[in-house]
């Protein structure tokens, strides 16, 4: 399972709720929020699965 975060970081994310679970066991509201966190983590954060943790 993976997400393409090559277009990130983005300055703002929509409020669309399509949760993804990160390897840090945090539920991110959508791909944009998750990808911004991936960039901030220098790539150490990965996708655990789609849906809530």
Curated annotation (Swiss-Prot):
Gene3D superfamilies: 3.30.60.30
Entry GO terms, CC: extracellular region
The entry's keywords: Disulfide bond, Glycoprotein, Protease inhibitor, Repeat, Secreted, Serine protease inhibitor
Glycan-bearing residues: 42
Position of the signal peptide: none
Main location: secreted
Site (described: Reactive bond 3): 15-16
Record-annotated Kazal-like domain positions: 3-53
GO molecular function: serine-type endopeptidase inhibitor activity
Annotated compartments: Secreted
Comment block on domains: Avian ovomucoid consists of three homologous, tandem Kazal family inhibitory domains.
Name the record gives this protein: Ovomucoid
Species: Peliperdix coqui
Taxonomic lineage: Eukaryota, Metazoa, Chordata, Craniata, Vertebrata
